Amino acid sequence: MNSIASISAIDVHGHYGVYIQADKTPIYNQMMTGDADEVVRRAAAVNVGLTIVSPLLALLPRFKANAAVGNEEAARIVAQTPGLKHYVVIDPKRPETYAQADEMLRQPQCVGIKLHPEEHGYPIREHAALLFEFAAARKAIVLTHSSEQNSLCEDFVPWANRFPEVRLILAHIGCGWDGDVTHQVRAIQKCQHGNVFADTSSARSIMPNLIEWAVSQIGAERVLFGTDTPLYSTAMQRARIDHADLPDTDKRLILRDNAVRLFGSQLD
């Protein structure tokens, strides 16, 4: 095992559960499905020691998910599954998820907040004030889907600048509703406090030079390893970083050290 493959990686963007989208075929939905044990098995096979998940039950089907029920399931499942931590999902259209998040963020298995404006069907700009106020009061880490039309990266920038207590992870480097692969990186360049990061969980990661370009623009310190497991292959996402055209010092930051610095003792 080479020196990079020997690093026990931390995946900051995973899921578990049943994938359900009405516009997809049954075989497609089946292929995107994986329970907690399967997520851990795939991670362990490529030396990913910890995966931070949100439950698909809290996100899907699109516009119909009950985030509160999904959060309750995650608290139970993750507590009994070594190798996992979880985010609590807030859906601002379901006010009860704020109170639920307040309680769950005090629990050792819950390390942050997950937002998904696309699956829950709301423009982030209409709810960002309350979401960021809530997260700032708790000095919470927030992982959000980006950059489709309800979750434009540029719409997060003023709030990240206004609330430096919030550490924000923009998911899916290279994702863009308009085909532009630069949204996450450009948003980070506009942020003033060093409190915004991006993860590698996009399917766009397979593009040659995308991850390398992102590092050249914002530094490896702002890039976190994510897989979007079980939707995408953990092994493929791990290999993309292991074999990136980057110095080993940068790979180590992306795979592990940045997450350790960001989440700290919450990962214990």
Question: Model segments located where?
Answer:
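Active-site gating/metal-coordination segments in enzymes
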Residues: 64-143, 147, 205
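Histidine-centered divalent metal-coordination motifs
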Residues: 10-17, 116, 145, 172
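Mid-to-C-terminal alpha-helical segments outside catalytic/metal-binding sites
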Residues: 1-16, 21-50, 220-222, 231-268
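Alpha-helical scaffolding within the catalytic cores
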Residues: 31-41, 69-74, 97-100, 152-157, ...
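Conserved, mostly hydrophobic/aromatic
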Residues: 13, 43, 74, 104, ...
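Divalent metal-dependent hydrolysis catalytic cores, especially in the metallo-beta-lactamase
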Residues: 26, 34-61, 83-89, 111-112, ...
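Catalytic pocket-lining loop regions of alpha/beta-barrel enzymes
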Residues: 111, 122-224
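Active-site-proximal loop/turn and secondary-structure-junction residues that shape catalytic pockets
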Residues: 57-58, 92, 117-119, 148-150, ...
